[in-house]
Amino acid sequence: MARSSSVRADASPFVPDSRALADLTAAVQACTACPLYIDTTQAVFGKGSAKPRLILVGEQPGDVEDRRGLPFVGPAGRVLWECVEAAGIDRNGLYATNAVKHFKHENRGKRRLHKKPAADEIEACHPWLDSELEAMPKVNIVALGATAARSVLGKPVSISAERRAPLKLGERTVFVTYHPSAVLRADDRAAEVRAALVADLAAAWAASRRPRSVKAGGG
């Protein structure tokens, strides 16, 4: 059952000891650490290579992702994969996930409109992201947007200030850039934001070319 609002929500009790991605994907469906699981179809875990060259972290699943159970399959996802292709990146070398695993939204008639996760919701869900990163040690990360950057780095981040300066996180390098939804919201700046996202993805991919010793996770 959901935690009382007087107690800080924490997904840690729901995360299994295993770092096998299949085990984590199954376990996340039982998570009720925060109220975001209410009125959603399912939790949406990461998808992609278990031994990637690069990890992409977004904010949260959207309406389409919640219904299909896969990350980045809605309008913003289409933009992301177009940018990945434009950057010359082999999609088979990627693992894509989100900082928050349930779709936060408000109902407007028959529509479900995205709502930005609050800081305590990002923190509550962080053990799930941590478990994914532990399954893929040393792999560089692209944080797509402010929510992803906050979850990965553990602090608020200005995208405009940090996107040209890769940050070290242990043995990883973190590249901060725009979320693909920013392209959809940019109106007359859409081409500029898209070009910046493509350039940042290409730079992250180029910096992650050397083969890494990566374990896929185990018991």
What are these regions (language model features)?
Residues 2-219:
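A polyanion-binding, active-site-adjacent surface
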